[in-house]
Structure formats: C-alpha cells, structure tokens
C-alpha cells in the first residue's frame, strides 16, 4: 500500500484504497532583480537596468552603471561665445620636469561665470538639464544648485591631467568651441584591476578608459567623483569649455535611514 494511503473497508469486506494525499507546497515568492529601499527594507524592481542575452538562456546584467548625460544646445549662442572668448584667464600653467614639460589648459579668473548676466541663457539651459538628471536618473525630488563655474581654454598642445571634482555631487562641462573630430574628454573606469588579461576587443567591462566625442554646443553631466582628463588639443583653433560643480539645496538624506544631513545647522 502506498505510504500515506488511507484504507477504507466496506461492509462486504472489500477494501478500497484512496489515492495518496498530495502535500500542498507553500507558494514560493517570485524572485526579481531589484534594489533595496534603505527606508523600508523592501526590494523594489530595478527600472531600466541594461541586459544582454548571451545564448543558451544566459542573461548578462550590468549592475550599478555610471550615468553620463549628453544634452545638445539648439539655440544660437554666438553672443555668449564672443563674451567667453574675451574673458580673462590665468597665465599659462606648466607641469612635469625639465625634459617633459606639460602645458595645461588655462582657467578663467572668474570662477563664478554662470552668475554673469551675459550667460543667463546658458545657465537656464544647464539648470533645466540638471533638474532632468536628478528627477529622471537619480529619481529624487531634491534640487541641485550650481556652486562654482569657470572657463577652460586650451591652445594647441595644452591638456588637463586626470582629476575628480571634490565637494560636488554632479559636475558638467559645456562645449561652445571644440573640434568635433577630437574627443575633448576622457573618463577612467572606477573598477581598477590589479590583474590584466589579454584583450581581443574592448567593451564596457574590460575598458580602463573611454574617450567621449562631443559636438559644439553640447553639455555633458556626470558624477563628480568620476575620474576624467582632457587630452592635448591638436588643432590650431583654441578649445573652449565651461565647467561647473553642483550641490544639493537645503537639507539632505533621510532620518529613518540615518543619512539625514541638516545643513542649516552647519552654518
């Protein structure tokens, strides 16, 4: 007799065996890729995470990608460019040793250029894209405000070393005058590798650097702690860009997740 079967006997002595009782399994929670909400502890579905099918049912995920937003400026800015060209800059900056002199690009004496009325339209454009970055990419209701902003001018042969932007959350660069065939900015991967394998083809997983081509009038926004540099200008025309930093307006964080930062108490 099968295990867990029930023996029924009728009055005639004939035996009837009921089928085994099936054990009901509790429903298994459906697993899904998501992110943990630090406030509630709940796992929320990840929105827009990049995936790729690898064949045989294998799926490749790109966790924690770095957001870099490129925004075109579609209005005429000839007046703003003329003002920018005439803006005073610091003297030529040199580095390296006697046998290997490096000529760095020059920065404007004014480190709050976006406060100037001559650049009011450019500032409005940048602020609108900052709001988009915060709302649609960072999914936050907070507001980022522009702190410092300055011009960078590079003659032929001038460059800028690798760096990050401290005391800033999102940084940006607007390019009013560049040569579109020469990428004006290079990013370095946050995933530094101690062991290097031979590489047949570079991709987002094995590349250490990424040179980003830009067009005149385009704006780029990126996390301020993302290491970047500026390759040497190889053209006769001066390369000009406008850089800026940002910081959240008002208090930051959340009390429940123990990340609350009352900036009004720090004054």
Q: At which residue positions do the language-model features occur?
A:
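Non-heme Fe(II)/2-oxoglutarate
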Residues: 50-138, 159, 238-239, 246-267
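Short beta-strand His + acidic residue motifs that chelate non-heme Fe in jelly-roll/DSBH
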Residues: 160-163, 228-235
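Active-site region of the double-stranded beta-helix
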Residues: 117-147, 155-169, 176-180
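Short linear clamp-binding motif
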Residues: 3-12
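Acidic, proline-/serine-/threonine-rich low-complexity intrinsically disordered repeat tracts
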Residues: 14-35, 40-54
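Catalytic core of non-heme Fe(II) oxygenases with the double-stranded beta-helix
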Residues: 152-221, 251-260
């Amino acid at each position: 007799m099968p295990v867990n079967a029930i023996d029924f006997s009728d009055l005639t002595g004939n035996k009837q065996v009921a089928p085994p009782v099936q054990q009901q399994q509790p429903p298994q929670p459906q697993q899904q890729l998501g992110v943990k909400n630090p406030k509630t502890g709940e796992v929320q579905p990840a929105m827009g995470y990049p995936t790729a099918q690898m064949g045989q049912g294998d799926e490749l995920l790109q966790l924690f990608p770095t957001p870099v937003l490129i925004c075109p400026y579609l209005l005429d800015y000839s007046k703003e460019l003329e003002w920018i060209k005439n803006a005073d800059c610091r003297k030529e900056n040199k580095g390296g040793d006697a046998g290997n002199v490096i000529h760095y690009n020059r920065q404007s004496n004014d480190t709050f250029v976006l406060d100037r009325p001559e650049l009011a339209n450019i500032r409005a454009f940048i602020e609108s894209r900052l709001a988009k970055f915060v709302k649609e990419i960072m999914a936050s209701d907070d507001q980022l405000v522009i702190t410092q902003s300055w011009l960078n001018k590079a003659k032929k042969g001038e460059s800028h070393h690798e760096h990050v932007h401290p005391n800033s959350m999102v940084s940006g660069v607007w390019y009013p005058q560049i040569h579109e065939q020469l990428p004006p900015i290079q990013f370095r991967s946050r995933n530094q590798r101690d062991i290097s394998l031979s590489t047949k083809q570079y991709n987002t997983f094995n590349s250490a650097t990424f040179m980003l081509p830009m067009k005149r009038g385009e704006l780029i926004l990126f996390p301020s702690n993302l290491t970047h540099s500026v390759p040497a200008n190889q053209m006769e025309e001066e390369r000009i860009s406008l850089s800026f930093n940002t910081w959240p307006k008002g208090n930051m964080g959340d009390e429940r997740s123990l990340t609350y930062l009352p900036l009004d108490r720090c004054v």
